[in-house]
Amino acid sequence: MNTLTVTSDVKGAIKQLHFNLWDSTRNDLHFLDIGILCKNDNCNLKIHLPDSGITPDVEDLSSKFIDNIPNAIFNAPVEIAEKNKIRVFKIENNLRFILSPFDKKTSIKDKDSEINIAVERLLDSQNILVAEYRYYRFRIKNFDLSKVIIEVDSKSKSFESSFSSCKVIDFRVNDAKLLPVIESQKIISSADIFEKIHFLYMTDVNEDIQLADVNYTTRFLERDIWDDYLNLGKKKRFDMIAYHLRQENSFSANFLIKCTYNKTSKKHLVAYAGIVIVLAIVANHFPALLCWLFSLLKNLFIALCVRIAYLNISFRFESQT
């Protein structure tokens, strides 16, 4: 099963889904961030990851919502207010939400790569909703990228093909046809409509990207803002770019991206440098090598002619005697 599934036991509880797939070789970033915007009401959310046979290693990201990170995550101005010591965020269309921490001790199910979140209605001291929505954001640190990224080996044996490779990102959400029959029927029968499903693919700036969907946007990830969010510490961060696709008013989504990337390693460079040096030496000595080869062939030809003449004379002499 190479599709993620996100469902709720209360219809209409989930408003938006956010998926950020980080795939940067230069920065050694390979994981998935998930954001769920749901109603501030009692419900149970279930997230099922593509089968990998391991328990999800989840990191809560609510503590990262400081400084300019909220603006960077939503790529828009975010207004933050405090109500009864609870931070309330306001984004587009006056949508207000509170940030809810992810409790991995009670939310992760060891079997089937499943994550469960029990949402409880949060009221203020006057029994009034603090905000209409709640937002969960967490990271799957050990997400198996091979479930959504297909490496394509080139059949070309050309010299240029040794420097680059191709991969296809096939990211699917609630794709019923990839599920077992019983599970797919459950998904279809409880199908809900999400206002928006966002998918962002973060990768190195030197990768050449092709997208099947023309309705996408690109964005250069701001320097210095993301370091703490990505847990980079004092490591130098190489530039990255984000490709943003989205599906509106749908229960499922299929995002397809094809990219070509540089796969040259130090071993490749040393081998190629050696080949270039050998070719340069051969090219530099080619005239002398050609003269030597011509002289060798000429001497062999003369020797062959002498040998033939000798055999011919010997044959005639034997015939006369």
Where are these regions (language model features)?
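Beta-strand elements of well-folded, non-transmembrane domains
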Residues: 38-40, 51-53, 140-144, 203-205, ...
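Surface-exposed, acidic/Ser/Thr-rich flexible loop segments
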Residues: 120-220
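Ordered hydrophobic segments in well-structured contexts
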Residues: 5, 16-20, 29-35, 44-48, ...
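A surface-exposed beta-strand-loop module
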Residues: 91-160, 234-248
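N-terminal pre-first-transmembrane soluble regions of secretory-pathway and organelle membrane proteins
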Residues: 1-132
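Hydrophobic, helix-forming membrane-interacting segments
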Residues: 262-321
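Short N-terminal edge-element motif at the start of the domain
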Residues: 220-226
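Cytosolic-side membrane-insertion boundary helix
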Residues: 228-279
